[in-house]
């Protein structure tokens, strides 16, 4: 499964990278046919976040490593190295830039952006 990784490099700059998560075929719930499943991530909770249309924030760092799974709307994220990504429904991002210069975010257009946040250990 492909996802985007946002991390801090050794100089504290936030950077994007393409990443992949292996999915192994297992008999998850017999007698249903086998499915493809990733390894388990430890998480204490799941949150949903709605960012209003036009919402903008200056450089921030996430409070902890977390997956953002975009459900609706579009968020433009700018890493501190200047690279921009437009993220929308179905996109998955592992936010790991918890230290350093952080990243900027902006909801594109008037439509709200809805995402699920899953903090991971």
Please report, for each region that a protein language model flagged, where it lies by residue.
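Short, Lys/Arg- and Gly-enriched loop/turn segments at beta-strand edges
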Residues: 25-27, 101-107
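Exposed beta-sheet edge/beta-hairpin loop segments within beta-rich domains
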Residues: 59-61, 107-108
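Short acidic, Pro/Gly- and aromatic-enriched capping/linker segments at domain boundaries
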Residues: 1-8
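A short glycine-rich, His/Asp/Glu-containing loop-to-beta-strand
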Residues: 10-59, 113-121
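Histidine-centered metal-chelating micro-motifs
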Residues: 55-57, 76, 92-93, 99-104
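Short acidic-glycine-tyrosine-enriched beta hairpin
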Residues: 21, 80-97
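A short beta-strand-loop-beta hairpin characteristic of the jelly-roll/cupin
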Residues: 60-61, 67-88
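A short hydrophobic beta-strand segment most commonly corresponding to one strand
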Residues: 92-98, 108-121
């Amino acid at each position: 499964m492909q996802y985007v990784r946002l991390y801090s490099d050794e100089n504290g700059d936030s950077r994007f990278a393409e990443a992949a998560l292996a999915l192994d075929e297992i008999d998850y719930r017999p007698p249903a046919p086998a499915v493809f499943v990733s390894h388990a991530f430890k998480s204490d909770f799941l949150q949903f976040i709605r960012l209003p249309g036009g919402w903008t924030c200056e450089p921030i760092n996430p409070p902890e490593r977390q997956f953002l799974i975009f459900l609706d709307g579009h968020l433009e994220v700018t890493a501190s190295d200047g690279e921009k990504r437009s993220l929308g429904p179905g996109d998955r991002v592992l936010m790991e830039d918890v230290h350093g210069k952080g990243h900027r975010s902006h909801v594109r257009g008037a439509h709200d952006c809805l995402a699920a946040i899953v903090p991971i250990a």
